[in-house]
């Protein structure tokens, strides 16, 4: 097996680790703007700041996963306070919906929509609530990850998705929490990176003793048992092309990625593993490989952990990581802004992995608050000179429609809930999370769904107290009705042409209630099907 040039790896790790000292005095948002502007100046870009209405909708969706109400939008847009953006950010970060939204984002990073082996429903709601509680308390990120990878209680669902497969667990843990892709070295040494099969199986060795057992209900039940044995190793047979039928391979001891092997105590003579199928709870081992990996992972000097977190949070709010893709932190994949990435990582560690602080600094920056405008030729994503445009997730889309039409006003018993469960179709067509990818492509199926969805039709039907009902019953002028419609749905005032056209549309010839209800419903339907509503910009 070829051995990669380890000095390159060592210098790479030392360079990063050496930067983790102290915190700077000036706000990080200022450093962000200075470093990003260097790129703008070099590329001769002149980005413009987003309008208040665009910023308002963007920050609500990014921090809460919802849009502002009509009353909130009207009041904030009329506010003349020069610090209103900063004050709004602080208010939204303290809103309980932010914790739920951020927990949902992290949950999707860890599991996606459809995790393997049917674990999408197992304790998923319990885990999201647990995670939301941690976010609400601003629990340090390293502590959250410690609890997740301890594998006890609600966080145990993370390991459950891999059902005791050490190799799959290694791939998932390194991708999510270290931002690295190690799966290529599962079958052969990486052709371009200094990553070998020994590295891969060394990491997998930390998870070789995880035990997963289905509980009541079998694979389709909600209960399962998760624990760790005192014995067991992964087996390595060499490269796939050299493997022979029936060959079991050699046991591989745990080894930290690009680091040393784990020093383990010797088990007592005559030690015998208990029959795990008969015990009520899987006993904890006297020495846990998994715990040793977690201790190493979250250390401040670990060059992967903090960088992966910073890069993913930056991508969440800026549309693209400083290293792109977000889960490919490697020696050959350089960041677009190396100095900024180093400073942000150093500050994140110095602030004891304070996620809320980091989010606040990112969204308060001028770089975050740019408009999605400018010449297409200047729209290179790594410059961050234009705001990213991303589709709403299914949760955001439903929350936005519900808020726009004031659905809860007519359905007080369903406050905060969807009009029925999110259907399989809605999840299929609208639900994939966005983490900096640029490959969104609307489909005919999505278009047909938005045109014919029973869920959406139910939400926009005019009822007393809803937007549709107010447009039907209100004695306000046509201009006032159109302003309410646009502020409610698009978080902005209508343009002159829109005001004229929608004013005529909302006052149909004949003027009977049925005609007004149809006009009201259709006007709302038109706006929620615009690209302006479907996307965050």
What is the predicted function of each stretch?
Residues 1-6:
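N-terminal secretory signal peptides that target proteins for export/translocation
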Residues 10-19:
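Bacterial N-terminal signal peptides
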Residues 21-25:
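Boundary at the C-terminal end of the N-terminal hydrophobic targeting segment
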Residues 26-53, 57, 67-97, 111-409, ...:
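Primarily short, surface-exposed interaction patches in extracytoplasmic proteins
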Residues 101-104:
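Conserved AdoMet
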Residues 403-429:
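Catalytic and ligand-binding motifs that coordinate phosphates/metal ions
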Residues 432-434:
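Adenylate-forming
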